[in-house]
């Protein structure tokens, strides 16, 4: 493993930001630290960078324990959420800043900066100031400045949070391509699930200072190891009594059920006959257009489920009584998530 955290603990007063955190990252991987606010993901990033010190445990980078190594000597590039560019420096000087601090040769600085300017797609804008750039361009300059000293590890704290939605989507793709091209080991913090899915090779789910799960986006989404991951990852509905749905086995000690939109099919009343015995009656509470599909909120008893309906199908309307078919559910048992299948249905409707 290129980066390893072993039994890391960090407390701020009564708040435990890191609770016996351990994980490893292979060289060249792009890792997403994903979790809700206050889950400890930024603390992990800052401890790896050397901006915070763990109370106990070891941080290992490329085989070396770096707990006592100053941040400036860890070979790390750090991209901050708010860019942290120098307002009165040009694009060129912002990117060159770290190299000048290292007292690098002027010729090398110029070659390195111009190479990075071309890499980030801002050739010709070297003399502009941050105020003359768009949010997306400023973030690219921040990336280049972090990369200028040729770090072996790149850390990014909510790198797209301050950018509008359209530019954010473009930058995600750009960042992934850039990191693949450079082959640099990278870790980014995000609370955006779509961002983590699209950009990361692997995701680490954080919750209350602990690591809930680590794996590829598909592994974590399809096979959540804990009740928290099952409920956090993806759009979900939580049901107190899953026996309201037909044809699901009972889980001894089962508590609540978690249902994702892709586990649910909503049809007009009596439209689907093949699995009629699995139908539960519901009432459409909301219909929202989502481009390629309609997003539905359907009340079944005391529960509101999220579902999707294709634009190719006859639309349902708010207030309409419909048939609801639930094909899969996660049942929580302590902090375990148990996947159950509707025993009367086939896999035809499951789309992930």
Question: Which residue ranges define each predicted feature?
Answer:
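Helix-to-loop junction immediately C-terminal to a conserved catalytic motif
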Residues: 49
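ABC ATPase nucleotide-binding domain helices that frame the ATP-binding cleft
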Residues: 42-45, 141
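Non-catalytic connector elements of ABC transporters
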Residues: 236, 247-352
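The feature captures the beta-strand-to-loop junction immediately N-terminal to the Walker
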Residues: 34-36
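Conserved ABC transporter NBD signature motif
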Residues: 57-65
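ABC ATPase nucleotide-binding domains
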Residues: 30, 71-81, 85-225
């Amino acid at each position: 493993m290129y980066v390893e955290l072993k039994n890391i603990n960090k407390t701020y007063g009564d708040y435990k930001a890191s609770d016996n955190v351990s994980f490893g990252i292979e060289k060249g991987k792009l890792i997403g630290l994903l979790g809700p606010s206050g889950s400890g993901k930024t603390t992990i990033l800052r401890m790896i960078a050397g901006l915070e010190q763990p109370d106990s445990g070891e941080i290992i980078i490329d085989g070396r324990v770096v707990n006592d190594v100053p941040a400036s000597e860890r070979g790390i590039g750090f991209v901050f959420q708010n860019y942290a560019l120098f307002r009165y420096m040009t694009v060129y000087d912002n990117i060159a800043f770290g190299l000048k601090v290292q007292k690098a040769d002027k010729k090398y600085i110029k070659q390195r900066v111009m190479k990075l300017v071309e890499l980030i797609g801002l050739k010709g804008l070297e003399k502009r100031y941050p105020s003359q750039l768009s949010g997306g361009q400023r973030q690219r300059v921040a990336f280049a400045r972090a990369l200028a000293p040729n770090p072996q590890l790149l850390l990014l704290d909510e790198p797209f949070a301050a950018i509008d939605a359209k530019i954010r989507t473009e930058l995600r793709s750009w960042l992934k391509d850039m990191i693949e091209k450079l082959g640099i080991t990278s870790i980014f913090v995000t609370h955006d699930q779509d961002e983590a899915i699209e950009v990361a090779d692997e995701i680490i789910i954080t919750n209350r200072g602990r690591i809930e799960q680590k794996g590829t986006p598909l592994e974590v989404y399809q096979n959540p190891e804990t009740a928290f991951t099952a409920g956090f990852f993806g759009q979900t509905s939580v049901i107190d009594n899953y026996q309201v749905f037909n044809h699901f086995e009972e889980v001894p000690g089962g508590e609540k059920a978690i249902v994702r939109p892709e586990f649910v099919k909503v049809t007009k009343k009596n439209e689907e006959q093949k699995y009629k015995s699995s139908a539960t009656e519901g009432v459409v509470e909301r219909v929202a257009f989502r481009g390629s599909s309609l997003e539905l909120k359907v009340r079944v008893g005391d529960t509101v489920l999220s579902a999707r309906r294709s634009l190719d199908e006859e639309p349902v309307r708010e207030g309409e009584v419909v048939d609801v078919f639930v094909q899969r559910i996660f049942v929580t048992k302590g902090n375990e998530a148990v996947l159950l299948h509707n025993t009367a249905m086939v896999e035809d409707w499951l789309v992930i």
